[in-house]
Amino acid sequence: MPITDHGQPPTLSEGDKKAIRESWPQIYKNFEQNSLAVLLEFLKKFPKAQDSFPKFSAKKSHLEQDPAVKLQAEVIINAVNHTIGLMDKEAAMKKYLKDLSTKHSTEFQVNPDMFKELSAVFVSTMGGKAAYEKLFSIIATLLRSTYDA
């Protein structure tokens, strides 16, 4: 299932949640390294996305050394971690992601297509598990929700 960012977000089955709960701790225990790898890969694939991060001072070839890049990578993975923590509280998860959508659309003016692209990089980095494809489709769709309203 490719990452989607329009329409009704998919629903995580109990099996999906179990798969995420079993594998996420292995990913998150090295969150600094893993989050930086995801963000750097995303910026490599979508160099224009760097324009959305005005605090990044490093040249494109030295992003891995920029403290602002490392901090943003951690912010992103911690938001994913928080979302995973809300998997059993669907209303709270939706509210959290819609609030992030509002912030990204009004305060940061992020191109909404980037949520889907970043989600796809996350999933490919995590081995493309179907449960993560569903999770990140939920994330991408709800982060885009304010833009489509």
Swiss-Prot record:
Highest taxon of the lineage? Eukaryota
Q: Which UniProt keywords apply?
A: Heme, Iron, Metal-binding, Oxygen transport, Transport
Respond yes or no to whether keyword Heme is given for this record. yes
What are the GO MF terms of this UniProt record? Answer: heme binding; iron ion binding; oxidoreductase activity; oxygen binding; oxygen carrier activity
Residues where heme b binds: 104
Database matches in SUPFAM superfamilies: Globin-like
Q: Which residues form the Globin domain?
A: 11-148
Which InterPro entries did the record assign? Globin, Globin-like_sf, Globin/Proto, Globin_lamprey/hagfish, Mb-like_M
Q: Which Pfam families match?
A: Globin (PF00042)
The entry's family comment says:
Belongs to the globin family.
Assembly behavior: Monomer.
Q: Which PANTHER family match?
A: GLOBIN-LIKE PROTEIN
Q: What else is known?
A: This globin is the main component in hagfish blood.
Q: What protein name applies here? A: Globin-3
Which organism's genome codes for this protein?
Myxine glutinosa
